[in-house]
Swiss-Prot record:
Belongs to the universal ribosomal protein uL15 family. Keywords: Ribonucleoprotein, Ribosomal protein, RNA-binding, rRNA-binding. This is Large ribosomal subunit protein uL15. Part of the 50S ribosomal subunit. Pfam families: Ribosomal_L27A. PANTHER family: 60S RIBOSOMAL PROTEIN L27A, LARGE RIBOSOMAL SUBUNIT PROTEIN UL15. Binds to the 23S rRNA. InterPro entries: Rbsml_uL15_N (IPR027386), Ribosomal_uL15 (IPR030878), Ribosomal_uL15/eL18 (IPR021131), Ribosomal_uL15/eL18_sf (IPR036227), Ribosomal_uL15_CS (IPR001196). PROSITE patterns: RIBOSOMAL_L15. The keyword Signal does not apply. One of its GO terms (cellular component) is cytosolic large ribosomal subunit.
Length: 156
């Protein structure tokens, strides 16, 4: 398609400053009032009034929240119901799970997991000992004839 006007860059070729006045008037952070959060209590106060919560200046001023110490935070290592179903035979061969009353007994902490999620399908009845499980995971295991037993998570 034919253009009616030259693109702005081509139109400005040879003009040195492309319509921004003296050299340096469209450079660095001085042309925008400073870098980052600079000036929010001075010349950019109108932005605080427009975008901040009324009266508090949030999120421009003050400290917000806290950083949880890594020693307190729990690192969740989840496994889906479908993945568990896939590895049951391998775990039985390796002797990592037992069988009790026609159901496999699986202790997730011993396998390196601490949460059971509900992705996938399971058709084998199992008894799963885990510190945490999602609602859908519990429903799927109970539907297959098994049960989920919640155990306390000992966190160091």
């Amino acid at each position: 398609m034919v253009r009616r006007f030259k693109p702005a860059v081509k139109y400005r070729r040879g003009s040195r400053t492309h319509g921004w006045g003296r050299v340096g008037q469209h450079r660095k952070s001085g042309s925008s009032g400073g870098k980052g959060m600079v000036g929010f209590h001075k010349h950019k106060w109108s932005l605080v009034m427009k975008y901040g919560e009324s009266g508090t200046g949030w999120p421009f001023y003050g400290k917000h929240g806290f950083k949880q110490p890594p020693t307190i935070a729990i690192e969740w290592r989840p496994i889906n119901v479908g993945s568990l179903s896939d590895i049951i035979k391998e775990l039985k061969k390796e002797g990592k799970i037992a069988e009790e009353g026609g159901k496999y007994v699986i202790r997730l902490l011993e396998l390196g997991y601490n949460k059971l999620l509900g992705g996938g399908h399971i058709d084998v009845p199992v008894i799963v000992y885990t510190p945490a499980a999602s609602r859908t995971a519990v429903e799927k295991i109970e539907k297959a004839g098994g049960e989920v037993r919640i155990i306390p998570l000992i966190h160091k």
